[in-house]
């Protein structure tokens, strides 16, 4: 992991001025050890805020004391944890990470391919997967899961915040739903999709 991160920092991050996302599948203690190494090299290379770890299953497999130790390292080095809520692995405790000050986001892992057929690019659907795998039942929990798929993703990608206020990017969708939790549970058809203020899809049909 040390040599890998050093090489990525030298050959990719510096050269192209990009962030690094490491997909970490190792479980339990070996995964925790890998997270420690990533945090160590992030600090040594001065890459705070430029590294993310996707999956990080080990965070959901270690004792609470070890989890808090790892979360502190992640928070100090500004390392983001990203999840796609895969069905075959232990999910990191997302809310507990946020409570410890760790940046967390959620997204799709290659949308749909031989790795997993369960993806459509629909982030409302992905938020439902997050909530289902995390056993979120209360409205505020479901909304938290949605926030990882929406605002947290924009923050990670360094995109402008979008609260539908004056000056925000005019990127938004229109759906028919009584509230956000219901929208996550049903992920209804997008009546309209706007990008930069331009209507690009209506009633499920692209307009370009």
Predicted features along the sequence, with ranges:
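Conserved protein kinase catalytic core
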Residues: 29, 61, 115, 182, ...
């Amino acid at each position: 992991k040390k040599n890998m991160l050093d090489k990525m920092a030298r050959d990719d991050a510096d050269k192209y001025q990009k962030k690094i996302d490491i997909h970490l599948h190792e479980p339990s203690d070996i995964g925790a050890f890998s997270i420690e190494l990533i945090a160590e090299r992030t600090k040594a290379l001065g890459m705070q805020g430029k590294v993310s770890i996707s999956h990080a299953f080990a965070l959901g497999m270690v004792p609470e004391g070890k989890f808090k130790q790892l979360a502190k390292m992640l928070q100090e080095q500004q390392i983001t944890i990203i999840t796609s809520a895969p069905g075959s692995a232990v999910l990191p405790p997302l809310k507990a990470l946020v409570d410890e000050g760790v940046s967390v986001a959620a997204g799709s892992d290659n949308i749909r391919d031989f790795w997993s057929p369960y993806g459509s690019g629909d982030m409302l659907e992905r938020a439902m997967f997050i909530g289902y795998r995390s056993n979120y039942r209360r409205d505020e929990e479901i909304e938290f899961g949605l926030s990882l798929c929406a605002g947290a993703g924009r923050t990670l990608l360094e995109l402008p915040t979008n609260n539908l206020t004056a000056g925000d990017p005019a990127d938004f969708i229109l759906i028919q739903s009584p509230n956000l939790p219901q929208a996550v549970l049903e992920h209804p058809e997008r009546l309209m999709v706007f990008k930069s203020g331009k209507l690009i899809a209506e009633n499920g049909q692209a307009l370009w």
